[in-house]
Amino acid sequence: MILFSSALETILEYKIIMNKLVIDVTNEKIFLMIITKDDIYNITKENTKINYEKLTIIINDFLSSKNLKIVDINAIYINNEARSFAGIRNSLSIVKAFNVSRKIDYYCYSFNDFKDQKDIKYEDIPNLCDKFKIKKNLINPIYIS
């Protein structure tokens, strides 16, 4: 195949920008983080039933505040530790809806998945999911009896 220099330049200029969204509703506060190529942003909200019901609005408002839309997100990482079943159920429903409607891959992780890792930060989650081969688009619930 022969490419002219202008065609090659066009190919080289096209880059896939990966924007990632981390969601954690298992703690005292709802935590959201956006990881872009250049920046990391995060917010927290009170962990209440009303905020669970408004989670889609909270996510969209957070994205809008950073000049992003849900279509700009390439992957979602969601904590599925068994601490807040209502929060996990609501957030998983929203994430699955994003997956079905926008084809956004999601990864359900638990901090227990990252054995022998210390001082884990939320911005490390995407790389740790890759390292520990967390499967995409699979919900693997953790049950405590």
Placement of each model-derived feature along the sequence:
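Oxyanion-binding and handling regions
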Residues: 2-4, 8-57, 68-71, 106-145
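Stable alpha-helical structural segments in soluble proteins, enriched in small hydrophobic residues
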Residues: 62-66, 93-95, 99-101, 120-129
